[in-house]
Amino acid sequence: MAYPGEDYDNDAAYDPYAYSNDYDMHTGDPKQDLAYERQYEQQTYQVIPEVIKNFIQYFHKTVSDLIDQKVYELQASRVSSDVIDQKVYEIQDIYENSWTKLTERFFKNTPWPEAEAIAPQVGNDAVFLILYKELYYRHIYAKVSGGPTLEQRFESYYNYCNLFNYILNADGPAPLELPNQWLWDIIDEFIYQFQSFSQYRCKTAKKSEEEIDFLRSNPKIWNVHSVLNVLHSLVDKSNINRQLEVYTSGGDPESVAGEYGRHSLYKMLGYFSLVGLLRLHSLLGDYYQAIKVLENIELNKKSMYSRVPECQVTTYYYVGFAYLMMRRYQDAIRVFANILLYIQRTKSMFQRTTYKYEMINKQNEQMHALLAIALTMYPMRIDESIHLQLREKYGDKMLRMQKGDAQVYEELFSYACPKFLSPVVPNYDNVHPNYHKEPFLQQLKVFADEVQQQAQLSTIRSFLKLYTTMPVAKLAGFLDLTEQEFRIQLLVFKHKMKNLVWTSGISALDGEFQSASEVDFYIDKDMIHIADTKVARRYGDFFIRQIHKFEELNRTLKKMGQRP
């Protein structure tokens, strides 16, 4: 879709950031120079290329038209219409295509014009300026060299407060609809910026006294309670948990949605906030609570709510990681294998948009690493294509992990784990240089302790596979262990190979204890009796299922051919 005044060729030589002669006058004082540069940037923003002006005006008109139409629909007591859907589609095209192209051309590593500079172009429309600032600050975090300043971090927080206040504190449903992709990106970026600020405030070594005083006097900015409050408020306002409960039981979610939850804006923000809470609790190391917030989401079924691929991938990444840390390896393997198969089959779809591809590709690589860890600690059969990829990427490292190389475990965990954070404001008078690493080091220690407990299990498993009966003392001798130490390790093997595994139900926390180990044993006096529990793959069932599917497809095609 082209917008009015889009003419790249005519403006190709235009440089909105051409330096004027007086910019060479630097004082040598870093603070004065920084202030001068900021003042210069603000002056520069007043000169906006025509193509950008036209784009902003078109963007504003599209959003304004949608809001006007939404007001009309609300007054007529209607939830939505084809007109609304069409305008949302136009905004999606602007958001995903036009904005990205213009960013690449004009603002690849520099900020977009400030909101104050474009305000006259949009009639000082408060709602549009909030949405514009959301994109403006997100671009600074992602692309601008040096990242956001302390002031920009604060300003972005206040802008999110304004956005969520507009949505949550209105007398009735806010007259706004946005594409699902943008709504997901809002929640995703909100949590990312909180995470970024939590780490930023812990790194005080290179901060001036003025910056530290500023942080000390504003402890409520990007406070964990305010972030949790926003996410829970969006969940409650949308009544999304009740909607999901009814939806998964086969009912109509609209019947329990309420005044706000009937509208796409609230429904999707509520759903994305549940995934946001999953992510936030995982970053804080509370894995049980992380999975509990999804108790009404059935992960193993396709859902009308899972329309944004990044949301799907993020959900499975954090659920899989939480399972791994809760020692539910079989569930972690199932979750990772399912989403990796999904990415493998839909990869071409993501390559159309670079930023989506980069994000999904990174989490894809991280999940392969986590799957390698889980399969080493709990060997079981997975999809052949995923297994092949895993062998190509991590074959050597998996062999080293099987031999008990703790360094490889730590290396893969460090690469693939989330960026943990502390919800507590640091003591700015005495901050340890590595204070920002403490949440990660704490989680790494928990993981490393678990690895250490299982260090001998891979070797024991390989010996058990070789025999059906063997004196305990003899097998202990093979492993250079005393008989008592070996009996302890056998007990550890029994304990660690029994996992709580999800079998049915909606809640991902449900399950029953199972063992997927390929060997089992019992001890009778001084003899160990071993049984191979590996089940031969039944290819016949697979082919029968495929034949039935093919016959069903054939019948469907015949019916389609008979239609007039």
UniProtKB/Swiss-Prot annotation:
Keywords attached to this entry: Cytoplasm, Initiation factor, Protein biosynthesis
Residue intervals of the PCI domain: 331-537
Gene name for this UniProt entry: EIF3L
Entry similarity comment: Belongs to the eIF-3 subunit L family.
GO cellular component terms listed in the entry, alphabetical order: eukaryotic 43S preinitiation complex; eukaryotic 48S preinitiation complex; eukaryotic translation initiation factor 3 complex
Location in or out of the cell: Cytoplasm
Record's keyword annotation contains Protein biosynthesis: yes
Function of the protein: Component of the eukaryotic translation initiation factor 3 (eIF-3) complex, which is involved in protein synthesis of a specialized repertoire of mRNAs and, together with other initiation factors, stimulates binding of mRNA and methionyl-tRNAi to the 40S ribosome. The eIF-3 complex specifically targets and initiates translation of a subset of mRNAs involved in cell proliferation.
Record's keyword annotation contains Lipid metabolism: no
Gene Ontology annotations of biological process type: formation of cytoplasmic translation initiation complex; translational initiation
Organism lineage: Eukaryota, Metazoa, Chordata, Craniata, Vertebrata
Stretches of the chain forming a coiled coil according to its record: none
Record text on subunit structure and interactions: Component of the eukaryotic translation initiation factor 3 (eIF-3) complex, which is composed of 13 subunits: EIF3A, EIF3B, EIF3C, EIF3D, EIF3E, EIF3F, EIF3G, EIF3H, EIF3I, EIF3J, EIF3K, EIF3L and EIF3M.
Molecular-function GO term, any one: translation initiation factor activity
Organism (species): Gallus gallus (Chicken)
The protein's name: Eukaryotic translation initiation factor 3 subunit L
